[in-house]
Amino acid sequence: MAWAPLLLTLLAHCTGSWANFMLTQPHSVSESPGKTVTISCTGSSGSIASNYVQWYQQRPGSAPTTVIYEDNQRPSGVPDRFSGSIDSSSNSASLTISGLKTEDEADYYCQSYDSSN
């Protein structure tokens, strides 16, 4: 995949205060079609509220696509079954997918960046 080396290069050059803000998410979650699932992403230090969180969906054999940006915004074409939220009290972000469909089976990644820039 041509994008993988570029992505690794960009991550290797991440500098600044936000580079020290680490997010942790569960290894896997599962639920039945038609149900609702929530995937959480917890910040290790600092305040998640001072960072924007994005969520990516990666289906097998495909490049990642953005499903949520700036904490809770959906790109054009992403169904409203996908929603994002921030919980400052637990220093975490969540991606919620309602009305699960088989096509939602994928890897999901959270990523943050400094919202002041």
From Swiss-Prot:
Keywords: Adaptive immunity, Cell membrane, Disulfide bond, Immunity, Immunoglobulin, Immunoglobulin domain, Membrane, Secreted, Signal. Residues 111-117 are annotated as: Complementarity-determining-3. Residues 70-72 are annotated as: Complementarity-determining-2. SUPFAM superfamilies: Immunoglobulin. Residues 1-19 form the signal peptide. InterPro entries: Ig-like_dom, Ig-like_dom_sf, Ig-like_fold, Ig_sub, Ig_V-set, IgV_Light_Chain. One of its GO terms (cellular component) is immunoglobulin complex. GO terms for biological process: adaptive immune response; immune response. The gene is IGLV6-57. GO terms for molecular function: antigen binding. PANTHER family: IMMUNOGLOBULIN LIGHT CHAIN. Residues 73-110 are annotated as: Framework-3. Pfam families: V-set. Immunoglobulins are composed of two identical heavy chains and two identical light chains; disulfide-linked. Residues 20-44 are annotated as: Framework-1. Residues 20-117 form the Ig-like domain. This is Immunoglobulin lambda variable 6-57. It is found in: Secreted; Cell membrane. Residues 65-97 are annotated as: Disordered.
